[in-house]
Design a protein with these regions (language model features):
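Short, surface-exposed interaction loops/tails
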Residues: 112-150
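Residue-level signal for short amphipathic helical patches enriched in basic/charged
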Residues: 7, 25-28, 40-43
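N-terminal leader/signal peptides at the extreme start of proteins
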Residues: 1-10
Length: 150
């Protein structure tokens, strides 16, 4: 009579080694994944702001052609051919993921956007002065992170 033993499965050491390797891979992959999400959101914001800048230039050219004076609209989103996804007209700081707003507060006008991680960013907007000899086309500032109130 033959006595054969079959060994099916993995040893405890092999399973532990696999778990350690998976843990190392996860420790490296998760931060890279989170960085790629943040970079994607920043790129999407840059695309929207670039579209707004191009729309403002076109609006200034159109205004110059019709009125003889280059001017920007009061609301920069009105310079776009198509409405931005997530744009709302509630005149407050964006407070919903993916929301874009234009608002006036304390004498300042700003564009705001909230990302999926609940971080908020703003861009200062000045439509410029269109009166008398002091006429000047406006300005659109750089991205600034809004620090949450404590």
């Amino acid at each position: 009579m033959k006595n054969t033993t079959s060994q099916n499965g993995f040893t405890l050491i092999e399973l532990i080694i696999v778990m350690v390797i998976l843990g190392i891979m996860a420790a490296v992959a998760v931060p890279r994944y989170l960085d790629s999400i943040e970079n994607a959101e920043a790129s999407a914001e840059d695309a929207v702001i670039s579209s707004i800048r191009a729309g403002l230039k076109q609006a200034a050219n159109d205004s110059l052609y019709t009125n003889g004076r280059a001017s920007w609209p009061t609301n920069p989103f009105h310079a776009l051919a198509e409405e931005v996804a997530g744009y709302t007209t509630n005149n407050t700081l964006a407070d919903v993921d993916g929301e874009w707003t234009f608002f006036s507060a304390e004498g300042q006008t700003k564009i705001s956007h909230q990302r999926a991680d609940n971080s908020r960013y703003t861009w200062d907007y000045d439509e410029g002065t269109q009166v008398g000899d002091a006429a000047a086309v406006g300005a659109l500032g750089e991205r600034v992170m809004v620090t949450p109130a404590p």
